[in-house]
Design a protein with these regions (language model features):
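Residues that recognize and position ribonucleotide moieties
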Residues: 1, 214
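Ferredoxin-reductase
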Residues: 2-82
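Short glycine/proline-enriched turns and hinge-like loops at secondary-structure junctions
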Residues: 18, 32-34, 98-100, 219-220
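Short cysteine clusters
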Residues: 216, 221-224
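Conserved small/polar residues in nucleotide/adenosyl-binding loops
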Residues: 228
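FNR/FR-type flavoprotein reductase catalytic core
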Residues: 72-213
């Protein structure tokens, strides 16, 4: 785990509220893997903001983070430019390592999609992906997923992009009971509960990355600890 200021190499606005930063942080990138996150200090705010790591480039010493503006802290982040520095603590969290010996299905919902991009890339070109969004205007990273996975299914609540419905509507038709597959998912808690329940019903292994408000990011304050 490291805590220092790292330079932003590039920024991209993905939609009206979502931004992507590529950050130069060689030692942090070297210690990162799928499902981990960083805690970013936002100006004069006391508490850091937890942001998932979307992509990791160990060779070039960079990570990509994708975040949605939800308050003053992330609004401050969205106003940063290439060349600015961010005070970052990380990498944090347990994460996971995709099992390449089994069929890999990666499911992202909303702002839970970015960490699944890095996971699908790590798994390889046989990755299968299901993405869920509220509407077409909320969709992000769809082209990037299509460039790394052999199959990408998209759902929206209102049917403006892909199939109308939820990610579980697609998943239940993609997998057979007890097949040699692993599902990896990140997104809103109701979505994760539905995905986990379906995987349990079909006797398929499932990993979920949980979203939670937190303060320290290392488990000491217990804000991010969930009972299960």
């Amino acid at each position: 785990m490291f805590q220092k200021s790292y330079k932003i190499l590039s920024t991209e606005k993905l939609n009206n509220t979502t931004f992507s930063f590529v950050i130069s942080c060689p030692e942090l990138a070297e210690e990162s893997w799928c499902g981990r996150f960083v805690n970013v200090l936002c100006g004069e705010k006391t508490l850091r903001r937890p942001i998932s790591i979307s992509e990791i480039d160990k060779q070039n010493g960079t990570i990509t983070i994708v975040f949605e503006v939800r308050g003053d802290g992330t609004k401050w982040m969205s106003e940063r430019k290439a060349g600015d520095e961010l005070d970052i603590l990380g990498p944090l969290g347990n994460g996971f390592f995709p099992d390449k010996t089994k069929r890999g299905i990666f499911i992202g919902g909303g702002i839970g999609c970015p960490p699944m991009l890095g996971a699908a890339k790590e798994y390889g070109s046989d990755a299968e992906v299901i993405l869920g969004f509220r509407s077409q205007e909320n969709a992000i990273l769809t082209d990037k997923f299509k460039s790394v996975a052999k199959r990408v299914e998209i759902t929206t609540n209102d049917g403006t992009l892909g199939a109308k419905g939820f990610v579980t509507d697609v998943l239940k038709n993609m997998v057979q009971n007890g097949e040699n597959a692993v599902v990896y998912a990140c997104g809103p808690t109701p979505m994760l509960k539905s995905v986990a329940a379906l995987c349990k019903e079909k006797n398929i292994k499932c990993y979920v990355s949980l979203e939670q408000r937190m303060a320290c990011g290392i488990g000491a304050c217990l804000c991010c600890c969930l009972l299960y």
